[in-house]
């Protein structure tokens, strides 16, 4: 059996993929992968996701420079969630310019921002458009 056949893909042919810092275990982001994205991730040793909004492969860092170098892939007990242990190049995983996409905490009935913006996202994406 092909290793990709062991995954319980959802009805859309996708599986949730959680990126974690390979040293600290901190959750950086969650995205989706289709079969091709997961296969390419394993081949290229970098995170490649499926963009549902754009309907195409999304090589993390292709626009921002914030590539996720793959250290390890893990599959959960139900074979329906992938974890990518990664090195986050540039220290920014979120398109908002933060280290993690999980920068809000629920406090007193509201979501509170608890993580700083490390770099203005307009500056991040403008830099890489001119390269």
From Swiss-Prot:
HAMAP family named among the record's database cross-references: HisI
Residues that coordinate or bind Zn(2+): 77, 94, 101
SUPFAM superfamilies hit by this protein: HisI-like
Protein task: Catalyzes the hydrolysis of the adenine ring of phosphoribosyl-AMP.
E.C. numbers: 3.5.4.19
Subcellular locations according to the entry: Cytoplasm
InterPro entries: PRA-CH, PRib_AMP_CycHydrolase_dom, PRib_AMP_CycHydrolase_sf
Domain of life: Bacteria
EC category: hydrolase
Protein name: Phosphoribosyl-AMP cyclohydrolase
Major place of residence: cytoplasm
Species for this entry: Stutzerimonas stutzeri (strain A1501) (Pseudomonas stutzeri)
A Pfam family hit: PRA-CH
